[in-house]
Amino acid sequence: MTPRRQLDESDVRVRPNPRGSRPRTKERPRHEDAVAGWVLTVDRGRYTCLVDGPDGEHEVVAMKARDLGKAGVVVGDRVALVGDLSGGPDALARVVRVERRATMLRRSADDTDPIERPLVANADRLAIVTALAEPEPRARMVDRCLVAAFDAGLQALLVLTKADLRDAGPFLAAYAPLDVPYVVTRRSPSGIEGLDEVRERLEGSVTVLVGHSGVGKSTLVNALVPGASRTTGVVNDVTGRGRHTSTSALALRLPGAGGGWVVDTPGIRSFGLAHVVPDRIVASFPDLAAGTAECPRGCSHDEPECGLDAFTAAGGAGAAGVARLESLRRLLRSRAGGVADAHEDPPDGVEALG
């Protein structure tokens, strides 16, 4: 039997790389020369970003770099850009990095959908635009938006429109215990009364505007930002609902010395809260949260022993406490996969608040 020969490095054959390319590596370029940008709008995989160049600010269209994988890029994101940053009609840059987000407003399709849908990053405030009539105000939708603002760490602002058609008092009374700031606007032959107060509230910050179609949100944006040309719609006489006119979120700079930005979003008909845990939902009802001290351990707030019933019956949450408790319970049931909340049902009238 032939003895085995000792092998050395000369016996190793290295197969040549047929493509002549470098082997794969997990190391990725750092892009230390990348330019900072701020995402203004997103459209079919293209990101319009504001960058500050030698000649001042200008807009750049970019695509997402492959290295980012499935990482999402949304309006309000602070990003790092490389490539053609000229802003010319045929120029296309690349988003190579998304910076850490300070806040993130998100929603889900419904209360049982596990997929979160990021809406706007790095905002300071959520302005909930609600018409007092035509279409009727939907209190439960307002409650949902307040929960989303609380969960995202955003300040909340109620902007009530069409006060020329109905008094804002009954609606505001329901939210008085929350101390949520508000502005009431009305249409007049000379324009929109209350617009200056809205502008003062928004100056120096990034504010997201949300609301049902038909509540006058796009009209408000066009008045705040002349030249914005956001399409306005009409309210269906039969359904009482508006038509979606804004099709994508868009950040617009507020004119004037105070500065600031508004992010106009498409009209919404639902605002799922599957991403918000029940305890956070309860905490976002501060007028009711104090009453939970009388609840038994592990209370679901929808059982006979719940202390919130006695708390609201005694007026602990104000005149609208009972209606607010029902809104909370509907949210919790919907999130648990039970009875669907009526945020998509026919409009809630002001009288339903209490």
Give the role of each language-model region.
Residues G56-A65:
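A short macromolecule-binding patch
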Residues M1-V35, V82:
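Short boundary/loop segments of OB/S1/cold-shock single-stranded nucleic-acid-binding domains
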Residues P3-R5, R30-D33, H58, K70-S86, ...:
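Helix-rich effector regions associated with P-loop NTPase G domains
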Residues K217-G233:
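A conserved segment at the C-terminal end of the G1
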Residues Q155, K162-V215:
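Canonical P-loop GTPase G-domain recognition
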Residues I115-R125, V129-V183:
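Phosphate-binding glycine-rich loops and their immediate beta-loop-alpha structural context
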Residues G45-C49:
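Short aromatic-glycine-enriched beta-strand elements
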